[in-house]
Amino acid sequence: MKFGWIKTTGNDLEERMESVKDALESSIPGIIAEKEEISSVRELGNIKIVSDNLDADVVLINKGEDLEILKSAKLSGKETGVYVVINTKEDEVYATDVSKLDFVDYVVLEGSDWTIIPLENIIADLFSEEIKIVSVVTNVKDAEAAYEILEKGVDGVVLIPKDINEVKDFSKLIERMNSESVKLDYATVTKIEPVGSGDRVCIDTCSMMEMGEGMLIGSYSRGMFLVHSETVENPYVATRPFRVNAGPVHAYILCPENKTKYLSDLKAGDKVLVVNKNGETREAIIGRVKIEKRPLFLVEAEYNGENLRTILQNAETIRLVGEDGKPVSVVDLKVGTKVLIKPDENARHFGMAIKETIIEK
């Protein structure tokens, strides 16, 4: 996972604390601050503080300072890092060497001209090391380039922002860099029938979804259906753009890092994966899960000779995504309708994808 920090900027403490507020409001996870600012930062909110003080969450020293400080910090349970300004080849060698010490978690690299920082050399030298490489930049364009160097890129970026808009753009960049892409394809509906009542799960998230977005749900791990969010206007009920009426308690849902969970296991605070019709994803936090007894529909579809099934609530507001990329209500499904699914050859063990023969029916 890529991460980002903000470095406090401003002529006085009040201005520098505005940087902290911007970071908090934009969900930036960390801030590099001066040691005299630590208490003020903590008063503003819960954010990882990186500073040259043992009161920080990450103890960060400059090149040339005593590494014994980091040893002590590590023993006290802190994360540690070294800040290196790259001006010469000797600086590059130092950064590589210090990164291989087992008590150093981060190496933070800054150069007077970012474009000539030998990040490629350092990334290549440290490819198999546990160290997290962090680059200091002054704009979002350079941040994106740093994340993508040698495909692997740096693990994190420190942005020295000009204004709140740049912080917001940085936050969006981090979200995009961490978004997973899933391969979707079309399956052909072969059967739709009511099956009686059961306990179905509504997932209410802390995010507003858009047309074409939903979640991947299914009775089988080998094929999950894109169940559309409640973003479609309806004369009978108001839209609920934060909600996916997902299906019964037994069904799988695709979560971040290609893991699955049972719908019955979800709870407030969990993260789920919002997926659009193009397979682009983003994370959403669950605010509430509602389990209620409702009438249910069985939906069967065929994909490459495989029979896939899912069960959904029997209601006109429950939708899959059709061949034209538009939502189609379950009450309008017909034999031959094509709907988006995520095919998967892997079985699942405690939500993890594994290579194993498994029969689901």
From Swiss-Prot:
NCBIfam families: PRK02290.1-2. This is 3-dehydroquinate synthase. Disruption phenotype: Cells lacking this gene do not require either aromatic amino acids (AroAAs) or p-aminobenzoic acid (PABA) for growth, and growth is similar to that of the wild-type strain in minimal medium with acetate only. One possible explanation for this unexpected phenotype is that a second, presently unidentified ORF complements the function of aroB' in M.maripaludis. Catalyzes the oxidative deamination and cyclization of 2-amino-3,7-dideoxy-D-threo-hept-6-ulosonic acid (ADH) to yield 3-dehydroquinate (DHQ), which is fed into the canonical shikimic pathway of aromatic amino acid biosynthesis. Its EC number is 1.4.1.24. It comes from the Archaea. GO terms for molecular function: 3-dehydroquinate synthase activity; dehydroquinate synthase activity; NAD binding. It comes from Methanococcus maripaludis (strain DSM 14266 / JCM 13030 / NBRC 101832 / S2 / LL). The gene is aroB'. Keywords: Amino-acid biosynthesis, Aromatic amino acid biosynthesis, NAD, Oxidoreductase. One of its GO terms (biological process) is amino acid biosynthetic process. HAMAP family: Arch_DHQ_synthase.
